Structure formats: C-alpha cells, structure tokens
Amino acid sequence: FCFMTYPIQLHGQSFQMHFSGALFWVEKSMLLISDVHLGKISHFRKYGAAVPQQAIQQNFDTLNTVVEFFKPKGITFMGDLFHSSLNSEWALFEEWVHSITSEIILVSGNHDIISPLKYENIHIKVISELVIDSFLLTHHPEERDGFFNFSGHIHPAIKLTGLGRQSVRLPCFYKTQSQMILPAFGEFTGIYTLEPCNGCEVFALLGDSVLPVPIKEVKRKPNTRK
C-alpha cells in the first residue's frame, strides 16, 4: 500500500510523513523540512546549466502545497534552506514568507551562508539546533543520549530491485532506533543511497505517495557520512 501521508509514532508523539519529503509533528503543529536548497537552480542557470526556469517556481509550489495541506503553526527548516549566497530567489522567498502565517525557524546547515540578519529582518529565527522535549533537531545526523534526532543533510535514498535486476533509487525517510533522516525537499538536490541496517525502517517517496519498504536482514550498518 502507498499513501499521500504515512503516520508514525515516536517517543509517544504522532508524526505524518508527506510525499514531498516534509514531516508534520501533529501535537506541536510543526512542519519539519530539510534541504530545500533554494537558489541552487538559479546558481546552475547562471553558469549555463540547462535547467528550466519553471523549476524555480516548483519549490515554492511544493511549499505552498504542503503548508496548505497541514496548516502548521510553525515551520522548522532543518538546514540548507539556501544553497549559496544571495541571488534572485531570495526575493521570491521573501514574498513566500510574507504570504503565510506560520512561525519559521531555520536550523542552519553547511550551505546556509546568508547572514542571519537577512532572516531576522523577515522574522525568521536562525539557530544551530532545536531541542523540544526528548527530540533533537539538527542539520547533520547526531547521536545524543536520551534524545531522538531529526536531521537532514544526507539526502537519503533507497535502492529497490525488481525482476530482471532492474532497479530504481528513490528518496526516502530513513529511520533508525534513535534517528530519522529526512529526504531532501528541494528540486535538483540529488540523492545519496543508504544501505539499510538491521532494525531500520525506510519510507520511500514515489510520485505523490509514501511507500513503506520491507527491509531484509543485513550485516552492515549504513555509512551516513557525506
């Protein structure tokens, strides 16, 4: 079975995984989104890459879709919101921020080099990590005793193999006992295939669906370095 959203319980809290790659925390009415990489498409186009102009708008259309679906009180971007320095997409982002009512927090990532003052001017709080109850929200995956960690950065994907050795790699939510790595939300962000570990749970994104993936027993843990 596959679904537009897929529910999961973590530390007694309810979450909904969305096919866009966003994760909704029900009790907090908070949307978690990682690795949008706004500005990346404009950056590529500037240097001659054949990326269609409409791809820029796609990121904002997807953001609008998921915000309208969940109507969150808060949105936490978990790093790499912007891919590089300021470009024309910043103005589009400002317009988008002013069009919604959700409170926005940015947990900064390695690509977030734009001055925090620019974010503060549009009422976005920039922090290095966010702790809420027994949950730790970071950009890079972290292990911290007593906490369940939500992170991004890896752009996780799973390789699915079918008949005739045909295979496909799909972005996914990747969950271990103490972590969940969110898929990259943005267009043209790339993916990094992880080898599932014993006890892991994987939820692949396929079109407008979230698909739970059965995991076979394996002997090695994934390399989550990138």
Describe each PLM feature range:
Residues F1-M78, F82-K226:
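Extended recognition/assembly regions associated with phosphoester-bond processing machinery
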